[in-house]
C-alpha cells in the first residue's frame, strides 16, 4: 500500500523519484511487526496468458484515471484529485525491485512466485509454514489457501469505493474448509462457481449469472462441469474453453523449493536506501527501526493467530 500527499499525488524525493511505495511498505512492516506478526513477502512472477486481457483493461482504466487526475489538477480541485489519484496506482519494475530490497533489508523473506503470488502463498500456508495469507484477493481460496486474512491494514480504515470517506475495518479471517462446508460444495465446485461469476482469467463471468444462481447451478450439476458450462453457455461468452481457466487454478506453476529465513534488520542498508538515496527523514526511519528492536526484545513473535485466538 502506498502513502500519498494530501491531493492524492505520489510522494517523491528531491530527484523526482516516486517514494510512496517505500513509505507505505516501511510503515506497514514496522506496524505489523510491532503487533507480533511475523511477515514474509511473496511477489508475482509471470502472469498467465489468460490474465493479460484483465491486466490490459486495468491499465486502460488507470490511464483514463490519470487523465482525469491531470484535469482536476489544472482546476486545483483537491477532492477530485484524490478521487482519481486512488485509481492510478501502478508499480514499475524498478519500484518492485526496490520493494524487494527494502523487505530483505528488514530481514524478512522474499519469495519469488513463478506465476501468481496468491498461488505460491497458498502452498506455503498449506505446508504449515505460515498461518495465513494476508490478502484481500479471494482468488487465493481458489488456489486452496486454507486461511486468508483480509483487511490487514495498519490504519484500521480503508477508503469507501468511489467515495472520499473512509470506513473502520478489522482483520477478517476466512477459512476455506469452513466456507466449503457452509456452502455445501467441494473445492472444484468452488472454482466452477467463481468462473461463472468471473475471475481474473475470465473477467465479468457469464452474463446474467450472479452468486446465488451460480451456487444453485453448481449444486445441481455436482462435478459434471461439461454439462454445467454448456448450460451456462460458456462458448457464447468466451473464445477459450472453460477447462483452460479451471486447469489454471488446479495446476498453476508453484515453487516447491522455497525458503523462509528471517534475519536481523540491516539498519545501515535501510538508512542508505531510504535516507541517503530517497531523502527520508533520518529521525523517522530510526524511530521505525528502534520500534522493531523493542518488539524483538519483548519476546518471540507469535504470529497472526494471536488476532483470532
Q: What do these predicted regions represent?
A:
Residues 31, 123-124, 140, 193, ...:
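Hydrophobic/aromatic ligand-binding patch that stacks against planar heteroaromatic rings
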Residues 15, 140-143, 154-165, 173-180:
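Conserved NTP-donor binding/palm subdomain of two-metal-ion nucleotidyltransferases/polymerases, i.e.
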Residues 133-134:
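Residue-level marker for buried hydrophobic side chains located in beta-strands
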Residues 1-127, 146, 154:
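Noncatalytic, basic helical substrate-engagement surface that gates or grips nucleic-acid strands
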Residues 165-309:
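Non-catalytic nucleic-acid-binding/docking modules located in mid-to-C-terminal regions
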